[in-house]
Amino acid sequence: MAKEILFSDNARNRLYSGVEKLADAVKVTMGPRGRNVLLQKSFGAPTITKDGVSVAREIELKDTLENMGAQLVKEVASKTNDEAGDGTTTATVLAHSIFKEGLRNVTAGANPISLKRGMDKACEAILAELKKSSKVVANKTEIEQVATISANSDSAIGKMIAEAMDKVGKDGVITVEEAKGISDELDVVEGMQFDRGYLSPYFVTNPEKMIAEFNNPFILLYDKKISSLKEMLPILESVNQSGRPLVIIAEDVDGEALATLVVNRLRGSLHIAAVKAPGFGDRRKAMLEDIAVLTGGTVISEEMGMKLETAEFSCLGTASKIVIDKDNTTIVDGNGDNERVVARVNQIKAEISNTTSDYDREKLQERLAKLSGGVAVIKVGAATETEMKEKKDRVDDALSATRAAVEEGIVIGGGAALIKASKKVNLDLTGDERIGADIVLRAISAPLKQIAINAGFDAGVVANEVEKSSNENLGFNAATGEYVDMFEAGIVDPAKVERVAMQNAVSVASLLLTTEATVSDIKEDKPAMPSMPDMGGMGMPGMM
């Protein structure tokens, strides 16, 4: 395929055209008075969203070169979303503003490489000031404020997320699902729950609820299949003498072993239940070890030189309660040693920070939550499927923003934090590096200006009012049109979101400015299909 090669200003201007188109579509969603964007899907009904990254992901431009520019800024939105969970619109607006200011200077003859150096230095200085001004999230109210702002000022969502985080802790897993009705619900599972139920319904102790419930049980953990009961007899006799129930968690229990356990359970001679171990392969071994740490037991494993028939009574774990239904097992208040639990939690945290796989990270975070607190499920309800998808997107955003706030603290919201931080920056630079730093310092007000525009106010007047104020916490409340103390008004942003958005925006804008040539495909128009030849003379002859 033939290629189109463009150089210097011609290349950068075409790239800028694509960046501008993407930014124009994304920035209308910004702020409490931002508008919705309607997205056509390849199948199903159109989606209505106010989520910047959802808009960016749908954009593909016809012009190849413009599309290259748009895709680079789309990457900014996606990366910001992956890293901080929110701030995609801020990152897009900043990248567009920095590229626009920089392009003007490059066209006027400034050296792009020197500009980039100055921009990087300004970015570092602003982020250092931002870090100084951040405030630790101290209570449930502040968590609620962050979640509410990120959910487009929906206080009901903010309250629900704060409630969920309060119950399962900052390391707990909070998942978002679609509800069956129109109202929102919050379900909290305390203790460790895994998705394996009883191996036989004959283990049920409460026929009305179809659950097996045991108080103060012993827990046997085995990493192999149990097919014969002979190897288990010593342990079973010891448990039977104690008069306490036993829950077996093994790779599988089948054949003679399962049949014998069921018969003894029905006779009432044993209070027992058997459950398959969660996970597969190495993950199963790790999860069995997690359960062992939580319950104070030991996984009986031949790899460790242990056999079921010689296992000691001390290998059994204990918990205050276990509830098993046909799909799930919940262990409440395991009696494990706190120091061992903390060490295990720290080990999993280290694995999370070292892994490069998103799937592994998700599974590790689930394990971490089960050890450290519990699992909360937010069920989002709405009248229509379109509304439910839009609402679910907002809840996901709010949840990610809240986690980011707990991690690195909060700063004043509404785009004011970056302006206040930039005012304190004093860099000793000269020439084009100075110009590069000034580009970033000027462009930093773009998010605040866009919030003001979307709310119907004069962007220049609002930005000037916030910038000249000596009150460190003063910002613009676009919902009411007032200048307020942002912390007091509860208008806050996670410091991590602002940091990641800023870093990614400067990174991609400086790369675009230092682009001197582009090579892209030339789309060739395919010739139209020729029309079918005339079929004259092929008809049936008339009847005589």
Swiss-Prot record:
GO biological process: protein refolding
MF term (GO), any: unfolded protein binding
Region Disordered, annotated ranges: 525-544
Protein keywords: ATP-binding, Chaperone, Cytoplasm, Isomerase, Nucleotide-binding
Cellular location(s): Cytoplasm
Residues given in the record as ATP binding sites: 29-32, 50, 86-90, 414, 477-479, 493
Gene Ontology terms: cellular component: cytoplasm
Catalytic activity, reaction form: ATP + H2O + a folded polypeptide = ADP + phosphate + an unfolded polypeptide
Known EC number: 5.6.1.7
InterPro entries documented for this protein: Chaperonin_Cpn60_CS, Cpn60/GroEL, Cpn60/GroEL/TCP-1, GroEL-like_apical_dom_sf, GROEL-like_equatorial_sf, TCP-1-like_intermed_sf
Catalytic EC class: isomerase
Superkingdom field: Bacteria
Keyword Isomerase: yes
UniProt cross-references to NCBIfam families, sorted A to Z: GroEL, PRK00013.1, PRK12849.1, PRK12850.1, PRK12851.1
PANTHER family found in the cross-reference section: 60 KDA HEAT SHOCK PROTEIN, MITOCHONDRIAL
Function, as annotated: Together with its co-chaperonin GroES, plays an essential role in assisting protein folding. The GroEL-GroES system forms a nano-cage that allows encapsulation of the non-native substrate proteins and provides a physical environment optimized to promote and accelerate protein folding.
Quaternary structure and partners: Forms a cylinder of 14 subunits composed of two heptameric rings stacked back-to-back. Interacts with the co-chaperonin GroES.
Similarity comment: Belongs to the chaperonin (HSP60) family.
Protein name: Chaperonin GroEL
Organism classification: Bacteria, Pseudomonadati, Campylobacterota, Epsilonproteobacteria, Campylobacterales
